[in-house]
Each structure stands twice: as C-alpha cells, then as structure tokens.
Swiss-Prot record:
Keywords (A to Z) from UniProt: Cytoplasm, Elongation factor, GTP-binding, Hydrolase, Nucleotide-binding, Phosphoprotein, Protein biosynthesis
Protein localization: Cytoplasm
UniProt cross-references to SUPFAM superfamilies, sorted A to Z: EF-G C-terminal domain-like, P-loop containing nucleoside triphosphate hydrolases, Ribosomal protein S5 domain 2-like, Translation proteins
Protein name: Translation elongation factor 2
One Gene Ontology CC term in the entry: cytosol
Pfam family, one: EFG_III
Post-translational modification: Phosphorylation by EF-2 kinase completely inactivates EF-2.
EC number(s) from the headed UniProt entry: 3.6.5.-
Domain of life: Eukaryota
Family membership noted in the UniProt record: Belongs to the TRAFAC class translation factor GTPase superfamily. Classic translation factor GTPase family. EF-G/EF-2 subfamily.
Modified sites of kind Phosphoserine: 488
GO molecular function per UniProt: GTP binding; GTPase activity; ribosome binding; translation elongation factor activity
Domain tr-type G: 17-348
Amino acid sequence: MVNFTVDEIRGMMDKKRNIRNMSVIAHVDHGKSTLTDSLVSKAGIIAGARAGETRFTDTRKDEQDRCITIKSTAISMFFELEEKDLVFITNPDQREKSEKGFLINLIDSPGHVDFSSEVTAALRVTDGALVVVDCVSGVCVQTETVLRQAIAERIKPILFMNKMDRALLELQLEAEELYQTFQRIVENVNVIIATYNDDGGPMGEVRVDPSKGSVGFGSGLHGWAFTLKQFSEMYADKFKIDLVKLMNRLWGENFFNPQTKKWSKQKDDDNKRSFCMYVLDPIYKVFDAIMKFKKEEIDDLLKKIGVTIKHEDSDKDGKALLKVVMRSWLPAGEALLQMIAIHLPSPVVAQKYRMEMLYEGPHDDEAAIGIKSCDPEAPLMMYVSKMVPTSDKGRFYAFGRVFSGKVVTGQKARIMGPNFTPGKKEDLYEKTIQRTILMMGRYVEAIEDVPSGNICGLVGVDQFLVKTGTITTFKNAHNMKVMKFSVSPVVRVAVEPKNPADLPKLVEGLKRLAKSDPMVQCINEESGEHIVAGAGELHLEICLKDLEEDHACIPIKKSDPVVSYRETVAEESDQLCLSKSPNKHNRLFMKAQPMPDGLPEDIDEGRVNPRDDFKTRARYLTEKYEYDVTEARKIWCFGPEGTGPNILVDCSKGVQYLNEIKDSVVAGFQWAAKEGVMAEENLRGVRFNIYDVTLHTDAIHRGGGQIIPTTRRCLYACLLTAQPRLMEPVYLCEIQCPEVAVGGIYGVLNRRRGHVFEESQVAGTPMFIVKAYLPVNESFGFTADLRSNTGGQAFPQCVFDHWQVLPGDPCEPQSKPYNVVQETRKRKGLKEGLPDLTQYLDKL
C-alpha cells in the first residue's frame, strides 16, 4: 500500500537539500484538493483509480459534505526521480549528490476567502507554492490575494492550469484559442508577481515561464498533466534536437512549417504555432477519437503514444476510456512531482533569503545564523503556525516548522507567545515537549526527533500557546514575526448557552475555539456577553458549528450577526478643549483632526509604524501628507494596541514636567482610542494634538490617577466638537456569471447599497466578471438572494476591502448613523441617548 515507512522518512529528513515544503493555493473551486490527490496516489497512499474523487486532504465531515476545504492539512510523501530528470536541478543546494529520493511536505489549503487565515498559516511554514488556476475562468480575486501573500512571505510560485478537460469538452475551444487562454493566464500571474516582488531581490527569478517548465497543464479530475518538458522528451530523439532548445521552441511566437521543415517567428498560411502542433494536436486527436467512438483510430493512436490498455479496461468507452488513456499517457503525479522537485527551493536555499522576513531579532545572533544556514546542530528555532485538534477532546497538536536545530521528544524548551519581549517574563514558559509527531492527512505517526527544514506536530505545548508562537532552546532568542492576515474579523455574533447552567462549558469551549482557528476572536464584553468575531458569514457558521459540536458540546443560542463599526471625525475641533483633573490642579488643552486620506491605510499596512526611526517616518509624512516636520517628529504613540490607525501628537511648546506625565497621557489615549465616545467602538483615522498642559509642581498631585481619566475626558470632548462620524466595513465583491444574469445582479446590489465599479468579460468564454463594493452590514444572506435572482448562475466572492464613512450625522435623531449608535449603545448596556459634551468639557 504505502511506498515508504516512517523510518525511511526520518532518514530523508536529514538530507535537507532533498526536502521540499510546499503549499497548494488557489481561488475557491479551482481544484486544489482534487489535484493534491494525484500526488497522494503517486505516493501510494490512496488507490490511483479513486484519485480525483477522494479529496484525501479534506479530512472533516463538513468538508466532504460541502465539497470545500476548510482547514489546511499536511501530508509528507516520499518520491524518487529518475536520472534524466535530476540533470535539470543545477543548484548544488537543491539536491544531495547521490540521492534520488525527495521528501515532499505538502499542505493543501482552503481557497474560500473566509478561511484565508488558514492559507497564511500554511504559507508561513512552506517555501514554495503550487498556484492552481482554472483555465476556464482564469485568474480570480482570491488567486491574486493568496499569490500576493505568498510573494510577501518570499515564497516561490509555480503555476498549474487545471480543468483542461472542461476547456476541451464543454467549451470546445480551438487549439489557437486555448493557447491564447494559457498565454493570458501566464501573463496575468506574472503581472501580479512583478507587482509585489522586489526586482533583483534575493529570490532571483520568480516569474513563471512555460518554456522553463515551471508551468503545468492538465486536469486534476481526470488525473493527467504535462509540462513542456514531457513533450520535449517525446520529440527530442525523433528530431535530434537538444531538449532545452526544444522546450524554448514549443512556447511563444514560434511557428513550424512541416513541408519546408523551417521555423519562423511569423504566422504564415502554411505554418502552424509549435505549441498547437506538437502539444495540443496529439491531445485533441486522442479526445476526438475517443469521444466520437472511432475504434480503429483509437488503436492507431494508442500505438503511437505507447499506451497499452489493461484487460479490465478494454470494454470501456467515452469519458471512462478517456480517463484511463490520458492517465497512463500523461500521469499527473509524475509531471507535478518533477515541477516541484526541479523548480521549488529546498529549505537550504529558501531559508537564506527568508530569514530576514521571519526573524525579529538581530540578523547576526546564533538563532538567525542557524535559520539562515538551516543547521540541525544550531539552537532549536521552531515556529508554530496553528493548532490542530486531536481526537482527544480539548487537546491540540501544535503544528509548525523547525527552522534551525532539531526538536527531540522529551527535550526542555522555551515556549514564547506572540507578546513575548526578550528580557521579560511574560508569555514565556519553559516546558518539556512530550512527543513529536508526523502529520499524514488523516493520520499521525510518532517520530523520535525532527531536524531543521521539516514540518511536524508537537504534543504537550498546547496549554501554553493560544494560536501561534516560537519554540526555542536559545536563551536570547527573539520571536519569529507574527503573521499578517489579509482579512480582518468584522462580523460578530453574541453566543449564550440554551441552559444557563452550561455557562462554564461555553467559556471553556470558547477558549478552545480561539486556539483552533488562526483568525477567530472570542471577546468577553463588560456587559457579560460572549462575542465571537469572524471574517464572514461562512467562517462564523463553521466556527459556531465547531463550538457547538466539538469544543463546548452544549446547545447554543446565537444572536443575529452584528458588524463592528469604527468612529472617526470629519473636521478639526471647533474649539480648544480643556479638561481639569479631579483635584483641579492639572489642565490639558487638546484638539482632534481627521487624518489625510490614505494615512490610516498606510499605518494598517505597516508603511508607517511605531518601530520606524522617527526621522525617516517624519520625512515620509512630510513628503506624502504635508505634515509639519517638527510635529511629525513628536508623535507620542499610535493607538489602539500601540499600532492602530490613530496618533497622538505633541504640539506644545516648552511645557514643564511634560515627560513625567507622558506615560499617563498615552495610557488615557489608548483607552479612548479603543472605546470611542459615540458607541465605544475603536477609533480610526483621528489625530489628536496636545497644545498646552498646566501641571501642579508637586509630583504627588499629578499621578496616573489624576492624569489618565482627564486625558480620556479631554479626548472625548475633542471628538464631540470635531463632527464625529461612523465608519462601516465594506466588502469587495467579485461575481462570476453568464451574460444573461448580469441584470439580476445589479438589482440585488442596488437593494443592498452596493455599487458596481467594474464589469468585464473573460476573454474566450461567455462569462462576465462584475466587481462591486458591498457594505458588510448588507451582506448577510447576500449569496442566497443573488442565486435566487439569477437562477443560481452567479457565484460571489466577498473580501473585506476598506472602511468607508456612513453618510449622515450620528448626532441628528432619525439619521441612519444615529440609529446604529443607539442600537450599539443598547446592546452594550450603555446609557441611551447621545453623550453630553458638558460632561467632558470644562470651563477655564
């Protein structure tokens, strides 16, 4: 059954040049899990005949039922390459001299946008990515998102065009049209790569190129695939041409004239594009003969391509026969495997250029050098990217990758959570690792130790980590960088147990839920509510189902989904706001003003961040946003959480004792930024200026207890005098549909305050792509509504895109923002009505 044992895999783990860590990424429903099957069956884990239907990596019951991948799953597989293929691996760090075997750690990740946090976790522990694109629908919004994430993490992509069977059987494209489709997809992918990749960077050439063999074509469902390398091998002997030369000739503007045996770069009447003639024609002939049941032709063709049909398959015809023939002529596992082994980097190569992206500490300490050289003798550095639930309720495997050193069963290690700072004790545990295990899709295998460059699971550290963290044996190690998610949790639901006696179980269940999903947030409100926040409707639905069935095991009542809002201001405060401390000895004078457009986004994406050098940051703000240089240098802090899109600027001149109260003012600012004045939602895009401070001369009269609440009152007064506004989150919605259904889409979007900003036809197909902005608040039940209005022909994908100001003034009764504020205040148990300015503003 399986072609290898755990001991063999353990042996391969030391040959780090022959390891490939890769993930499969793509748009939803482009066929990742189906394609993964052909690799898994090549390794002998599942029967070849079942490949394409098994979806081996969809391990959960709801994944099989819904036919979507929800969690990313890992499999380790062992393969051997033939001598003739090994020649293509030129870099000495890409393979050991005498070793033909390769250990491939493959992670199948979900394509659905609601689970893109799972993709981020998968990308962090891998070095290469197989990007799957459906050749009928082309490059979609999610393909772009995941590809962008991959490039940002410095992960090398290779491309696979899936669903060729659809292009031939359903759309019945001509060879030339099909070539143009491929050409367009390759160009689109390369444009995305070029946009996000730094040219001349350490990764070298990242763009994909069919003539180099880094692009594959085929059909995962039927289990066949090829790269230009396979076809060149068939022709190289016959034409007596060098293989690499031929591969270059088979793609692009190369035309061949069979009469005169001449190549040319132009299209004439009697010559034909080489890709169509030598690659597509044979495939078309096989398809044509089999689907039109031409018995004699089939036998001739099979002799030519060297396929013999087994006895039990001899009475098949039509699609069934097509599958058998294509599968034995161009087996998908083989083509994919060669692409992976030849074009994806080994840990030795990849960690050289990924270290600076991964490690927060100095780039020349022991840990950094260990990661850079992928050295199993260096101190252990392992990054845990997610938690995987075990069969034992409430316990988790920590799933991650060893970047340097080796992890051994029973060794003592430092477990550092994401909030750990070197030299402090918080978020740090010294514990023993109970067991190390190997992840195999649906099964796990125990293993003694795992050296650097490999992916594994750990038992016994789940109590000390929430979701992610670093495990190390090096005393002065810093953390590995925290993962950046491309979506943010904006949809929330309040949950409560149906039977109040079950409350402790619910709390316990929420803790486990927070562990098991990289993205979900569980919040305890002060009013005693338990809130679960997720990326979208589907994400929340799956999380609540898990909570009910696996984590808490009790029946649960849930509220309607609620959207998080943000508070902001529209203009500068109309007066200088003054607040006095409770003992009347200290006074603060401040104003609020909105940030210029684009700055909050710059802060979110880290182009302006608190860790920058203040001079470079000030220069950036002055050039791009025309801030005053002296003020831009005196940004005290960002908030909320020290990194959010609001700033506190010191514009005062020569104030005594100012630095002594800085900490207290900052604490008050963080408090106000986290809970705004209108509805206690986070602030966004507000800049507060401190103009003057009068303080008492005795230090005892200006302690934190005097200053912090005063700062908060003063900031609230600033907000109320600066025309407060609410912001709501907006989805970018991409909808695929045939031309007839476009009208129905506009109707649905208009009813839901959405607006279309782009509409394009996918060249070569009858499909239209409509892009629109849709407020998250209006998106509940959108999919069902859309399908009923278009006869089930439209497929939407919604990604969180940006925040936009809700039109209207929340201070005017009966306006929409006013109602939102009232509902939120009621839900949070605050006093009804609007906050009163006189509570916060003092007279001189």
